[in-house]
Amino acid sequence: MEKDFFYSDMALDNLERGGFESLALHKKLSYGIEQIVVNLKDKVLSDKVGKPQGVYVTYDTSKATDDRYADYLVRILSSTITQLVGGLARGSIVLSVGLGNGEVLADSLGEMTMRKLRPTRVEYLTDTKFKLCAHSLGVQGATGLKSHEVLGALNDKVNPLPSS
């Protein structure tokens, strides 16, 4: 593995391991939830961090095992997704994937968030700004599939790109 390359599913982990943690914007929210935003606009930085260019948002909390907090966090997540796609060009295709184990509350937030979204990439909805697809994906132990395998196939088929 290269000296300047770090691997994690989360951009935030890679920032911390690479000594770039000052690039993460931290914001305290209600119920002890912290929002951390990593904006990798620069190609050189995104290469060093080992993540494609983009905006990465992480929510950190220890209270996701409580239904009240989980519901609040799911609302925040779905709102964040809506904000992130709001700046895209009309007709862009957005693929939102919730990862986790739906059988364990603390790990089911991805699935719960996908249920809150309103997919608009359906044939009868023709006048939407962007075309949203939402999918929840279980963990490898429950599905036998690695997340990147399924996401790669979805990405190839859906081709979520900004409209030209």
Walk through the language-model features, giving the residues of each.
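N-terminal amphipathic/basic leader segments beginning at the initiator methionine
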Residues: 1-53
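Conserved mixed alpha/beta catalytic, RNA-binding, or beta-rich assembly cores of soluble enzyme
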Residues: 61-67, 71, 75-163
